[in-house]
Amino acid sequence: MNKAPTTLIIMDGFGLTDPGPGNAVSLAQTPQLDRLFAEYAHTTLSASGLDVGLPAGQMGNSEVGHTNIGGGRVVFQDLPRISRAIDDGSFFENAAYNKAMDDCLEKGSSLHLYGLLSDGGVHSHIQHLYALLQMARNKGLARVYVHAFLDGRDVSPTSGKGFVADCQEKCRALGVGKIATVMGRYYAMDRDNRWERVQLAYDAMVYGEGIQNPDPVDAVAQSYENDVTDEFMEPVVCDPDGTISDNDSIIFFNFRPDRAREITRAIVDPEFDGFQREFFPTTYVCNTEYDASMPNVLVAWPRIPVKNGLGEYLSAMGMTQLRIAETEKYAHVTFFFNGGVEKQYPGEDRVLVPSPKVATYDLQPEMSAYEVCDKCIERINSGAYDVIILNFANCDMVGHTGVLQAAVKAVETVDTCVGRVVEATLKMGGIAMVTADHGNAEVMLQPDGSPMTAHTTNLVPFILCGAGNELRPGRLADIAPTILDVMGLAAPQEMDGQTLIVK
């Protein structure tokens, strides 16, 4: 017998705010979403700050959003967890950090600190780097090198120069640390197997190859003069003595796993074959668990498991489920949605659609949405699934480019696809829910008219198609209990979210 699915459609980066010249959501032609808002019960959800386990006022992001949606509860995030440890002093007692630094003292080797030099709080926080520098000073380490990955997505595209200058000043004040390399996250934090990019980052940090400039602040300024903003800054070597070599220690201070895996694997995995390089031993600390299969690493902050999240609970109830997304958001509907669990649960199928191989997604704002849509509808029509979790990446990934017209096209693409998926779900007698994990495309311009590439703290929509006449406002943690509610299932006690349906 064919199943009538409950389909959750996550429009990544689709927030709500007043219409305006930089609002790609309101500027776009969205006949499908307009119709859904007119015909079905809808409400708004909080997707930032304390409501998703982040510090008050901190913008949400895809990892946090999917973890909260899948968990059915507010999941306390790594950013405040690590920041709180700095405040209470337990940070400096961390076993992995101490092992890395003690190995340097024992072997007379160098300590390398690398990660995203930003206060965006999505992948990292610069204050965590500063705490590591303070710890290195307290231990009396002599050779400490910072490899700075510039952001330009979760913060202003030209904020990197200021962060580099601040980092230099912090090193001077502490009397420890030198910036060895500077580069855009485009190279060091790829997540789409673009090994030619990762290799340029690797070659700069390990071999000292790349543009040479002893002044890291000037290196960033030169990049701006060439009209290359932070995210895309080519790797620059500032101190050729600061290359990574045998028996050195490395602490990767990013706490978000998805963009930390590739460069980490290139260094720690003897079986790595993304590009030619020689393996050598290091003491390597991942700030959080980037990948359970990663060899030769220590984990500073092991993940606190999310027990009885939606995926695990549906599986235990004998239900079937599908997770589908293109490459850029595949980890979010699987690993993050499952609370940091890589393995598939019994009854859980996964479909990965490759993201297009373009330099930046403003060049192809439709990305792979139409193929994701087609494959999802095939699976809906198969009648094989009780629950389908689907992500459209466009509004977020194109929003990050800062190109307004491309973001408008991205919203219009998602609108078309959402309409088709909802229609297919309802035709099968199912229920469709349309929501987002955080805002982005609804604010594409800064107040001064310059591009806005970061996420927002705006509310996100929630539309319930095929069930329920009245909904209350809520937060992302309320989505899983709502899914269980429309399926006639009681939520497990671990879920503290509440159904959005007003009884």
Model regions and ranges:
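Feature captures the catalytic ectodomains and active-site-proximal regions of enzymes
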Residues: M1-K503
